[in-house]
């Protein structure tokens, strides 16, 4: 059990038989009445976001989420197969479990898989990945004066905005959290 006074962003709790991750929280002390904690919670199974108030000091069960390092192996139809780095056990993941990270999956990439009661509830990708540019329009001399950008299709099929000087075949570092170009690799 954890007190609502100890809430912090990223903490995983159980509320109404569901598992939630705290996205935002705020301690509120009104002029009249008891203090409370206003939270924004994300359901780890459905991805839905809900707001909820907890009384100050209210005890809430902490969800014991296990994080295992796994390696992404290959795509099999609608499923993505990952292997546990310690036990070599394979786990099948759906696109919904991976979320937007599907665009950046590359074979042999290490992932953090989150389990709750033996069920996959989420996937943590590395913060950055190195991907090759599969297609982009060639930059024209003088384009860089404005510091603009152009779309580039990466080897995984993801489309990102890149500076004009980036050409096909170059390897780029991409931030998986925002989907933005960081720099050349």
Curated annotation (Swiss-Prot):
InterPro entries: Elong-fact-P_C, NA-bd_OB-fold, Rib_uL2_dom2, Transl_elong_fac_P/YeiP, Transl_elong_KOW-like, Transl_elong_P/YeiP_cen, Transl_elong_P/YeiP_CS, Transl_elongation_fac_P. GO terms for molecular function: translation elongation factor activity. One of its GO terms (biological process) is peptide biosynthetic process. GO terms for cellular component: cytoplasm. It is found in: Cytoplasm. It comes from the Bacteria. Pathway: Protein biosynthesis; polypeptide chain elongation. Keywords: Cytoplasm, Elongation factor, Protein biosynthesis. Pfam families: EFP, EFP_N, Elong-fact-P_C. PANTHER family: ELONGATION FACTOR P, ELONGATION FACTOR P (EF-P) FAMILY PROTEIN. Involved in peptide bond synthesis. Stimulates efficient translation and peptide-bond synthesis on native or reconstituted 70S ribosomes in vitro. Probably functions indirectly by altering the affinity of the ribosome for aminoacyl-tRNA, thus increasing their reactivity as acceptors for peptidyl transferase. Belongs to the elongation factor P family. This is Elongation factor P. It comes from Desulfitobacterium hafniense (strain Y51).
